[in-house]
């Protein structure tokens, strides 16, 4: 019937978004840092950064919840313009940037000043 019908064309129209969500789920399932269950764990491993309006930036530190990654840096730019953030120097694996995500990594970064595009997320992981 027309009320409960599935528009199968939307599967193809939204394939990119669906793939992005699948990678987010894969990232969460593959890393215990994203599955902390107690307030104590969160208090011990979650550190927020001071940011400009429109930005949220935080780190999951010290191999949170037994994760293989020593630190995970997450930056969300909810503003309508690109924003510059400072990432601590080091060897970072780029997990998500500019509307792309890959749980195994998109590339690498040395940290420093990074531009986060408008309405996007940046996820970095430090293994050591």
Q: Where do the model's predicted regions map?
A:
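Loop/helix patches that line or flank the sugar-binding groove of alpha-linked glycan CAZymes
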Residues: 1-91
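A broadly tuned, weak detector of single residues within folded domains
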Residues: 17, 93-96, 112
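Acidic Ser/Thr/Pro-rich low-complexity disordered segments
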Residues: 34-37, 101-106
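Pocket-edge structural micro-motifs
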Residues: 59-62, 96, 118, 126
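Short acidic, gly/pro-rich beta-turn/loop elements at beta-sheet edges
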Residues: 68, 83-84, 104, 124-126
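Conserved active-site loop/cleft motifs that coordinate metal ions or position small ligands
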Residues: 74-76, 94-95, 123-125
């Amino acid at each position: 019937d027309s009320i409960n019908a599935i528009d199968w064309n939307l599967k193809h129209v939204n394939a990119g978004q669906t793939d992005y969500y699948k990678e987010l789920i894969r990232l969460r399932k593959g890393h215990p840092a994203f599955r902390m269950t107690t307030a104590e764990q969160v208090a011990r491993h979650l550190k927020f950064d001071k940011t400009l309006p429109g930005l949220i930036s935080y780190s999951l530190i010290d191999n949170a919840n037994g994760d293989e990654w020593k630190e995970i840096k997450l930056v969300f730019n909810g503003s309508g313009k690109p924003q510059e953030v400072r990432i601590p120097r080091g060897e970072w694996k780029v997990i998500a940037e500019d509307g792309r995500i890959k749980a195994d990594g998109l590339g690498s970064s040395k940290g420093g000043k990074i531009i986060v595009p408008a309405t996007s997320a940046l996820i970095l992981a430090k293994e050591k």
